[in-house]
């Protein structure tokens, strides 16, 4: 049996060959399925409608201020916010990754999605009220207000942008490229460039409001399209009972070859395929990791991740924010039916390809020697759906990819502009900040395209495990800092900084080791030292989280506390304080505001036609009237208001109980 040190380069080379080799004749012919008037018409209509919604949002919304561009002026209602939360989370990586892992191991992977409902409630009821009362636009900005200093803010901003590139953008582009290559037969980089260019147009011109409105449309398309595919898949397989029976017998016809002795467990469906909670030691997703590890990574993703939180910060009021979280919570219970089970059905219908285990056979089927599970969902779309509906499902994949990327681009530009650019250009005017945010999106596009070759050679196995593993190595220390920052006022800057540093080092040790040695497979176990890679990544997330908390609390209690006068409305115990807060970053903010006022006082120069057109597209055409001091105070009060009307507070609280009951039944049935 080859060691992983030699197996990894082989896997990397074969994965890279996807973009250069023709693959099997069957895959090459799949693109012919889309070459018909019905499918092409549906795709064209999709792009026209999405562009129309983007232009409508661009004209309708205020994009000429930082608050309008990045937070939609706190004017969004619950239903587009809820749809945007869902669409921002569900990228093409979910369709490819969840379906692929479902095909390989069963329904346990759905726990990564379904447990999110609880953290969405934590977000709406506990975290967002603090963020709004603090008056922040970004998560690093909250750390600066809470702890003072600049190193935490800069550290978290840089780390968040790094995570955007290696995790979110890379996974979405890789999975989207798989589908687009099969469906359209386009060159990989040409397809990616076109998609990223269209995505960037919405983000650069429209701001957050445009992103949310297009996300709402994308969410509707995703839900309708994936529901139709689910119906077709279950009809084809003969219903649910037939599905459960046939899946357990979906064994590939070729299980020997390449001079390998292949264990039956590598190609036989697992006995616990239809259970979410699995053995604590031998399970691929152990139940303690599901119960305790997943909530930690979900805490980082749903309550601290800029992409998600930014959508909640733009709500009209707290009732709208909570209602949006509830809507998204309901929608997060659907992936098991819309993505995971269709992936399992794909294994039944196309067993020799989706469940291939012999490396040479996998190369013959899909051009990759480490497995073809990532092709489970695209195969269903291209071979099962009739004309017209294939175009609809391609639109679904485009929608999931573009909605996720628009969200990432907008939030990443917010992080760069508000947390990093203002450190470089302290005297930047509001106009300059808006332009800088839009230009940074262009930089992200270039970075994303350059990252594609790295993604190709890194994704030999199941995509969803890659994304969750990276989240488990980088997310827990951030989750620990924000959790104790909000719920323990004794924590100070020194504790938070060293907790993040220790957690980052431990996380990078595991992540770099896995990149170096590989994660292994059923055929070739990893040669990574057991002391580093011997525990499941979800268990490692638990260890990271509690080590970070111990360091944060230990250092904080050994150093001076932050006086309460700096913490009013920044932590839970002081959330309702009426006293005036003296921000730890007050001097920096006053200096920046004075510099901004100096530039804004300059007279506006006459503009030509080209300049006016450019300003119209970028939301810079209207010079907002200067607010009086009273108007500034009123605006600040609106942006930091967390009050609710009693009736609507009761309505959302009742809906929480209903959601919890539905989720309890869901887990009780599938556990």
Swiss-Prot record:
- Coiled-coil intervals, chain numbering: none
Region annotation Disordered: residue ranges? 583-604
Q: What InterPro entries does the entry give?
A: Na/Glc_symporter_sf, Na/solute_symporter, Na/solute_symporter_CS
- Composition bias (Basic and acidic residues) maps to 594-604
Q: What is its main location?
A: membrane
Question: What Gene3D superfamilies does the database record attribute to this sequence?
Answer: Sodium/glucose cotransporter
Give the stretches traversing the membrane: 39-59, 66-86, 90-110, 117-137, 160-180, 182-202, 219-239, 289-309, 325-345, 379-399, 435-455, 468-488, 495-515, 538-558, 651-671
Q: Which residues lie on this side of the membrane: Cytoplasmic?
A: 1-38, 87-89, 138-159, 203-218, 310-324, 400-434, 489-494, 559-650
Q: Where is the composition biased (Acidic residues)?
A: 583-593
- Relate the protein's function as given in its record: Generates D-glucose-induced depolarization in a pH-dependent and Na(+)-independent manner, with activity in acidic conditions (pH 5) but not neutral conditions.
> Family per UniProt?
Belongs to the sodium:solute symporter (SSF) (TC 2.A.21) family.
> What is the protein name for this chain?
Solute carrier family 5 member 4
Q: What is the lineage of its organism?
A: Eukaryota, Metazoa, Chordata, Craniata, Vertebrata
What gene name is listed for this protein? Answer: Slc5a4
């Amino acid at each position: 049996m080859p060691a992983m040190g030699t197996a990894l380069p082989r896997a990397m080379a074969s994965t890279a060959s996807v973009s250069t080799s023709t693959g099997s004749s069957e895959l090459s012919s799949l693109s012919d399925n889309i070459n018909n008037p019905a499918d092409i018409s549906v795709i064209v209509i999709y792009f026209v409608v999405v562009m129309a919604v983007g232009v409508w949002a661009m004209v309708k919304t205020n994009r000429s201020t930082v608050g309008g561009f990045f937070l939609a002026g706190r004017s969004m209602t619950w239903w587009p916010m809820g749809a945007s939360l869902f669409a921002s989370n569900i990228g093409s990586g979910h369709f490819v990754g969840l379906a692929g892992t479902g095909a390989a191991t069963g329904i346990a992977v759905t726990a990564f999605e379904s447990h999110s409902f609880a953290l969405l409630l934590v977000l709406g009821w506990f975290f967002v009220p603090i963020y709004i009362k603090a008056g922040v636009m970004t998560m690093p900005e909250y750390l600066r207000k809470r702890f003072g200093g600049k190193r935490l803010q800069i550290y978290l901003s840089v780390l968040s942008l790094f995570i955007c590139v290696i995790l979110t953008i890379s996974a979405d582009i890789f999975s989207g490229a798989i589908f687009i290559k099969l469906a359209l037969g386009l060159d990989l980089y040409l397809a990616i460039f076109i998609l990223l260019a269209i995505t960037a147009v919405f983000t650069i011109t429209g701001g957050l409001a445009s992103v949310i409105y297009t996300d709402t449309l994308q969410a509707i398309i995703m839900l309708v399209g994936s529901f139709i595919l689910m119906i077709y898949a279950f009809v084809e397989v003969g219903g649910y009972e037939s599905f459960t029976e046939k899946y357990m017998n979906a064994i590939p016809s070729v299980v020997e070859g390449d001079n390998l002795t292949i264990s039956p467990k590598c190609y036989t469906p697992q006995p616990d395929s239809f259970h979410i909670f699995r053995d604590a030691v031998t399970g691929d997703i152990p139940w303690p990791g599901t119960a305790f590890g997943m909530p930690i990574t979900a805490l980082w993703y749903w309550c601290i991740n800029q992409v998600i939180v930014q959508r909640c910060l733009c709500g009209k009021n707290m009732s709208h924010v909570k209602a949006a979280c509830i809507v998204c919570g309901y929608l997060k219970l659907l992936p098991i039916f819309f993505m995971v089970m269709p992936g399992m059905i794909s294994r039944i219908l196309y067993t020799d390809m989706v469940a291939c285990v012999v490396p040479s056979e996998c190369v013959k089927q899909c051009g990759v020697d480490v497995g073809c599970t990532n092709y489970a969902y695209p195969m269903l779309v291209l071979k099962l759906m009739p004309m017209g509906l294939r175009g609809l499902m391609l639109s679904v994949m485009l929608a999931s990819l573009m909605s996720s990327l628009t969200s990432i681009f907008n939030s990443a530009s917010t992080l760069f502009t508000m947390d990093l650019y203002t450190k470089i250009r302290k005297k930047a005017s509001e106009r300059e900040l808006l332009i800088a945010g839009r230009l940074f999106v262009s930089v992200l596009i270039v970075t994303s395209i350059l990252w594609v070759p790295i993604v190709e050679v890194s994704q030999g196995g199941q995509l969803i495990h890659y994304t969750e593993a990276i989240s488990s190595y980088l997310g827990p220390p951030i989750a620990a800092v924000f959790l104790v920052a909000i719920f323990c006022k004794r924590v100070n800057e020194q504790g938070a900084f060293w907790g993040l540093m220790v957690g980052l080092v431990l996380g990078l040790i595991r992540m770099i080791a896995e990149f170096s040695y590989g994660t292994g497979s059923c055929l070739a176990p990893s040669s990574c030292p057991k002391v580093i890679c011997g525990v499941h990544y979800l268990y490692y997330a638990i260890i990271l989280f509690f080590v970070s908390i111990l360091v944060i609390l230990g250092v904080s209690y050994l150093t001076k506390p932050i006086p309460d006068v700096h913490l009013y409305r920044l932590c839970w115990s002081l959330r309702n304080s009426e006293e005036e807060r003296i921000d730890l970053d007050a001097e920096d903010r006053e200096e920046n505001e004075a510099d901004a006022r100096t530039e804004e006082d300059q007279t506006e120069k006459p503009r030509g036609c080209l300049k006016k057109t450019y300003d119209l597209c970028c939301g810079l055409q209207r010079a907002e009237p200067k607010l009086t001091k009273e108007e500034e105070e009123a605006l600040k009060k609106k942006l930091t208001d967390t009050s609710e009307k009693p009736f609507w507070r009761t309505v959302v609280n009742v809906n929480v109980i209903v959601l919890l009951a539905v989720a309890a039944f869901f887990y009780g049935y599938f556990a």
